[in-house]
Design a protein with these regions (language model features):
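Signature of extracytoplasmic/envelope-associated structural regions
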Residues: 1-345
Length: 345
């Protein structure tokens, strides 16, 4: 079925699927209102010009295989859709349906018809998660199937007043397919993305810190793509590198502050709790929310250069790590209206 501008269907895979090793794919599918969907197929060639064949001309190269393919997705930070990419990069996490008893990290009771998703650092060193994508260009009758799409980075930052999300990674297998004849369905337009204004000053941060002006974060997923004797010209396996996912924050402050500078110079560790709280409600008076908590340390400081002006701010990268007491480096909690991201485990 054609759709203006095309569409992309996303579904969770049990394990990253290659050409010849398909695992189960979720029947629960998602169509994201992307602003851009990227894909690319790097081709491997064998150039036999170096052989002694009695002539000096170049030989046409032979196609011998494919490197891991590039994929990406750009979209606004929608509260329901962020969870799918978290599932794909971090696994299922811990799901609890709102019941009038459980609370969110702010201590607010979550009613029925709300859902709490929690992803905690140090719990992902099991199987690698991935997505299957159908990419449809209806006007050109081009239909692309991608398997084994592993998110290697999720980056969230403000674009003006709107929070944007950029997801990038590689995948194992890309091919053309017949028209999948899908019928895209999207969240209602009434479900809006998180805004910069949905974030206030953090509930917990370094004492006496400067006033925060903007906040973005990056979640990196270190994986490696490899080949076995699978009978395929494509790579067919994805491994964790032995390092867990890493969360970093890019913080902009309105002014320079001696406490922030002292914390950087001393390598001071501190606890963080910050959140986006939407002005839209999931049900009743309970809004969409996104929380980041963890153990942080300033890793650098880029202050504004001294100029003939009253106020000077700065940019501070923040790194998260496991505390000496064993507390996980970070916890990400999403409160939204989705009760399932996958029909496969």
């Amino acid at each position: 079925m054609a759709a203006a501008g095309g569409y992309v269907q996303n579904a969770i895979e049990t394990t990253p699927n290659g050409q010849n090793n398909p695992s189960a794919v979720s029947a629960t599918t998602f169509y994201h209102p992307l602003t851009q969907a990227d894909w690319q197929v790097p081709v491997l060639w064998d150039d036999r010009t170096d052989e002694l064949r009695g002539f000096s001309d170049n030989v046409q190269p032979d196609l011998v295989g494919y490197d891991p393919q590039v994929w990406g997705a750009n979209l606004r930070l929608y509260p329901n859709l962020f969870g799918l990419y978290m599932h794909a990069i971090h696994g299922l996490g811990t799901f609890t349906a709102g019941n009038g008893v459980i609370t969110d990290p702010a201590g607010v009771t979550m009613p029925a018809s709300t859902n709490r998703w929690v992803w905690t650092a140090g719990t992902t060193n099991t199987q690698v998660r991935s997505l299957q994508r159908h990419i449809v260009y209806p006007d050109q009758s081009v239909f692309i199937l991608q398997r084994g799409c592993v998110p290697e980075q999720i980056q969230v930052q403000a674009d003006g007043e709107v929070m944007k999300m950029n997801v990038t990674g590689h995948n194992l297998y890309t091919a053309q397919e017949a028209d999948p004849a899908l019928s895209p369905t999207y969240d209602a337009l009434t479900v809006k993305p998180f805004l910069r204004s949905h974030m206030g000053q953090p509930a917990t941060w370094l004492a006496q810190t400067a006033t925060h002006a903007s906040f973005g974060f990056t979640l990196d997923n270190p994986v490696s793509f490899d080949r076995t004797l699978s009978g395929s010209a494509f790579p067919d396996i994805v491994d964790r590198t032995g390092v867990d996912l890493r969360l970093t924050v890019q913080l902009s402050t309105r002014n320079l502050d001696t406490d922030d500078i002292a914390a950087l110079l001393a390598g001071t560790n501190f606890t963080v709790k910050t959140s986006w709280v939407s002005t839209q409600f999931i049900t009743g008076s309970y809004p969409y929310k996104l929380f980041i908590e963890g153990n942080a340390v300033y890793s650098d400081l880029s202050p504004d250069g001294l100029q003939h002006q009253i106020r000077h701010g700065g940019t501070i990268p923040v790194t998260f790590g496991r505390s000496s007491g064993g507390t996980p480096s970070y916890t990400i909690t999403l409160c939204n209206g989705v009760s399932s991201y996958s029909s496969v485990s």
